[in-house]
Amino acid sequence: MPSGSHWTANSSKIITWLLEQPGKEEKRKTMAKVNRARSTSPPDGGWGWMIVAGCFLVTICTRAVTRCISIFFVEFQTYFTQDYAQTAWIHSIVDCVTMLCAPLGSVVSNHLSCQVGIMLGGLLASTGLILSSFATSLKHLYLTLGVLTGLGFALCYSPAIAMVGKYFSRRKALAYGIAMSGSGIGTFILAPVVQLLIEQFSWRGALLILGGFVLNLCVCGALMRPITLKEDHTTPEQNHVCRTQKEDIKRVSPYSSLTKEWAQTCLCCCLQQEYSFLLMSDFVVLAVSVLFMAYGCSPLFVYLVPYALSVGVSHQQAAFLMSILGVIDIIGNITFGWLTDRRCLKNYQYVCYLFAVGMDGLCYLCLPMLQSLPLLVPFSCTFGYFDGAYVTLIPVVTTEIVGTTSLSSALGVVYFLHAVPYLVSPPIAGRLVDTTGSYTAAFLLCGFSMIFSSVLLGFARLIKRMRKTQLQFIAKESDPKLQLWTNGSVAYSVARELDQKHGEPVATAVPGYSLT
């Protein structure tokens, strides 16, 4: 076909597509009305408790199973005749991949559905565990048990946690406490069961059975019924337009370079809208705080038992300390969530989170002075309780900053930020122990890291409140009839009286004032 007729054919297709847009606009308006009819407030119960149960099982099948992988440590080391460092990489890889790929889980959940994401993750995790039962080398386990299983867990973990936040508002902290207690309860139950399976069926049989158990993630995914909330920052019209734009992109992108450029622009706009919270100053501060918090919390679970042994505690008593820490962690998950949902603390959940992180940091600072079992038992109780407390409030604090709509994507980023500290903090602590000959420097560094995390968030919140108070004072001084609002950089004063013609408030910039 001549080039001129080719251009004419392409042009006619584009013109036809453009002529169809008015009809599509009517369809979009109709769908927007349907979406508005379906939107609802968080039910704070009902099917929400099934979502909590599903998330509880997800945390058992992901975080508890990950913790139980350490039970295979001696079996892997003996069978493959490898040293501690090589064998320890298995646990580090699965934990790191789970956190690193958490944003991928959010993307799949947002663009397909939470149900599809969790079911797909369950299939991948189960496949990884089953293939691991046929491993012939540690490198095989790095790929199957580490990467494949970790990727499956990542697709399940953050979407399930985000779904709880969509179904609860008044009792959100309690719901998260119950859901995330699955990690501690699952470890408490699965640890002896996995040890029994290894004794009865060898490590290969135990991994095969765990692979079948993890398939329950697919059942959990089926429980995650989607819900549309009234308070979502993106309106139903915006959501439908974004979906329709993606369909249009697939339909017209082959026709011309112009439509390809338009398609890329639309995709960038959709992604920019989904991750717009990354530009929020509050979220940036939270992200930095999470890095320091994650660095501090990890080494204790690796070095508490060795430290107890170094101060003269027996092997059985040292293991008992870890059991205490795990059980109290569960209590902290549930009770602290319930307490912060009470009316007297409901508006101070952010402060409660800071308090819990700071208390764990103080426990670290006291640990080098505790050199007997009667002193280490109260330490395990205190650290375990506040560890469970702040883990419960991480999604609550994230919701307060970014809102419910962006919660899944934001949690993906927050858990992604845990990955590198989880990977590097135990080796750094070990190097400090080897260099100094004691655990003091390692524990002090972890303690100051967690305290800095708490102080940083608290200081940022204090500055934000001082700024808000100052802006309100300026507005009242300039004109008592004016109300103040801000776009993040420039302060505006808005008259309470509405314009009679258009029914819209009149906004004028506050002279001589800027937030930056």
UniProtKB/Swiss-Prot annotation:
Disulfide bonds: none annotated. Changing residue 67 to A: Abolishes creatine efflux activity. Does not affect plasma membrane localization. Pfam families: MFS_1. Residues 1-50, 461-516 are cytoplasmic. Most highly expressed in kidney, followed by retina, lung, heart and testis. Very weakly expressed in brain and liver. Also detected in lens. It catalyses: creatine(in) = creatine(out); guanidinoacetate(in) = guanidinoacetate(out). CDD domains: MFS_MCT12 (cd17424). Changing residue 387 to A: Does not affect creatine efflux activity. Keywords: Cataract, Cell membrane, Disease variant, Membrane, Transmembrane, Transmembrane helix. Gene3D superfamilies: MFS general substrate transporter like domains. The chain crosses the membrane at residues 51-73, 88-108, 116-136, 145-165, 178-198, 207-227, 283-303, 319-339, 350-370, 377-397, 410-430, 440-460. It is a multi-pass membrane protein. InterPro entries: MFS, MFS_dom, MFS_trans_sf, Proton-linked_MCT. GO terms for cellular component: basolateral plasma membrane; plasma membrane. PANTHER family: MONOCARBOXYLATE TRANSPORTER (PTHR11360), MONOCARBOXYLATE TRANSPORTER 12 (PTHR11360:SF318). Belongs to the major facilitator superfamily. Monocarboxylate porter (TC 2.A.1.13) family. It is linked to Cataract 47: A form of cataract, an opacification of the crystalline lens of the eye that frequently results in visual impairment or blindness. Opacities vary in morphology, are often confined to a portion of the lens, and may be static or progressive. In general, the more posteriorly located and dense an opacity, the greater the impact on visual function. CTRCT47 is characterized by the association of cataract with microcornea and renal glucosuria. Microcornea is defined by a corneal diameter inferior to 10 mm in both meridians in an otherwise normal eye. Functions as a transporter for creatine and as well for its precursor guanidinoacetate. Transport of creatine and GAA is independent of resting membrane potential and extracellular Na(+), Cl(-), or pH. Contributes to the process of creatine biosynthesis and distribution. This is Monocarboxylate transporter 12. It comes from Homo sapiens. The gene is SLC16A12.
